[in-house]
């Protein structure tokens, strides 16, 4: 356990020293379990399985039994460190140098979890060991070890497990690194959806000297790529930027220079706003492909399953409360933003309003991932401000 159980830096260092490269836990959830159990939380460790994937350990802890109920969510798994020799400091040592805490997960998101735990423990220590002196209210932690990989045995199943137990949540703070430049500049109130597919064009293989005996899919797939990018998917909304389709690879699997290939494939991803669902986008894209094919090109799309729909937490009392806590500590009025990639908030939104607010994300997933120690202290103060206002 940390030498100071309510100190965010000490908690973060203990977490960073657990090399929990997804799907490994490496003791990270145990660090949290010991801290929360000692503070009076009812702590549950739950393992979920899925054929073809690793078994994943998860943690759910709650103190209090009544509303209002605020949940802090997050993940303790991290991406691989890459070339560890390229790191200035050991990726799993949790070392501080020149006021910066180094380590894989310092930003994404062990640092954020450490701040939320420290803030909650400090809050409880000044409120008689309860969310509110009256005994009303609940605080919980919903922590998974399966976010950075396939995300099938983590938050999505932990929420289902909690709901089956009768757990209900009023609001959730997900401590992902939401800030762009400085702590306090951004609250994520939603995320775009994500849909991936492979455009496949069938041709007829043949010798390049006899093109009339073959059908070359390469110029055909190039024409379809141009056609799909020619017209915007939408113009955006009040809370989302326009949906965007990006091709990420074009492949024919043909090492020869004298053979017309039989097939061409192009992979793409769409980041979409709340004007679409995955199903409506599939219909739209397939219609555009067929229109561009005419009666000559033979094309189809192989869609990947998507569990990442667009969502937004409408600005209101809860976002105002969090923004006020941020401005009170940092002096910054945060932007309410829906940019970036997907997160586990896409699962949480089906159970309660959720916002994302954590550290600054500039070094996440990079060599020498790091965060200023001062930011850990500031984020802890902000979370404490959220709790003070929430249980006022």
From Swiss-Prot:
Assigned EC number: 3.5.1.18
Gene Ontology biological process: diaminopimelate biosynthetic process; L-arginine biosynthetic process; lysine biosynthetic process via diaminopimelate
GO molecular function terms noted in the UniProt entry: acetylornithine deacetylase activity; cobalt ion binding; succinyl-diaminopimelate desuccinylase activity; zinc ion binding
Catalytic function, reaction form: N-succinyl-(2S,6S)-2,6-diaminopimelate + H2O = (2S,6S)-2,6-diaminopimelate + succinate
Family: Belongs to the peptidase M20A family. DapE subfamily.
Database matches in PANTHER family: ACETYLORNITHINE DEACETYLASE, N-ACETYL-L-CITRULLINE DEACETYLASE
Name the record gives this protein: Succinyl-diaminopimelate desuccinylase
Species, as recorded: Rhodopseudomonas palustris (strain BisB18)
Lineage of producing organism: Bacteria, Pseudomonadati, Pseudomonadota, Alphaproteobacteria, Hyphomicrobiales
Gene that this sequence comes from: dapE
């Amino acid at each position: 356990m940390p030498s100071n159980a309510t100190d965010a830096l000490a908690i973060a260092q203990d977490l960073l020293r657990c090399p929990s490269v997804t799907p490994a836990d490496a003791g990270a959830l145990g660090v949290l379990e010991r801290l929360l159990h000692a503070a009076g939380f009812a702590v549950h460790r739950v393992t979920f399985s899925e054929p073809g994937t690793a078994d994943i350990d998860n943690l759910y802890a709650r103190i209090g039994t009544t509303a209002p109920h605020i949940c802090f969510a997050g993940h303790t798994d991290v991406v691989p460190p890459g070339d560890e020799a390229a790191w200035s400091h050991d990726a799993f040592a949790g070392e501080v140098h020149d006021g910066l805490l180094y380590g894989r997960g310092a930003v994404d998101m062990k640092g954020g979890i450490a701040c939320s735990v420290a803030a909650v423990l400090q809050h409880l220590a000044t409120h008689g060991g309860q969310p509110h002196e009256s005994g009303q209210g609940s605080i919980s932690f919903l922590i998974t070890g399966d976010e950075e990989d396939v995300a099938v045995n983590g938050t999505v199943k932990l929420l289902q497990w909690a709901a089956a137990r009768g757990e209900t949540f009023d609001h959730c703070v997900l401590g992902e690194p939401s800030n762009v430049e400085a702590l306090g500049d951004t609250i994520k109130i939603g995320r775009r959806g994500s849909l991936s597919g492979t455009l496949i064009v069938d041709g007829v293989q043949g010798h390049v000297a006899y093109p009339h005996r073959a059908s070359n899919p390469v110029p055909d797939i190039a024409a379809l790529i141009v056609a799909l990018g020619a017209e915007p998917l939408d113009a955006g909304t009040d809370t989302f930027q326009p949906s965007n389709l990006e091709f990420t690879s074009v492949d024919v699997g043909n090492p020869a220079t004298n053979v017309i290939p039989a097939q061409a494939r192009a992979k793409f991803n769409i980041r979409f706003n709340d004007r679409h669902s995955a199903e409506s986008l599939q219909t739209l894209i397939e219609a555009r492909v067929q229109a561009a094919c005419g009666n000559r090109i033979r094309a189809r799309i192989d869609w990947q399953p998507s569990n990442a729909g667009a969502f937004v937490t409408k600005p209101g009392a809860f976002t105002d409360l969090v923004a006020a806590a941020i401005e009170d500590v940092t002096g910054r009025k945060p932007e309410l933003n829906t940019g970036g990639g997907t997160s586990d908030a896409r699962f949480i939104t089906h159970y309660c309003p959720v916002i994302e607010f954590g550290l600054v994300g500039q070094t996440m997933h990079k060599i020498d991932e790091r965060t200023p120690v001062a930011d850990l202290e500031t984020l802890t103060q902000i979370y404490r401000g959220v709790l003070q206002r929430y249980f006022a």
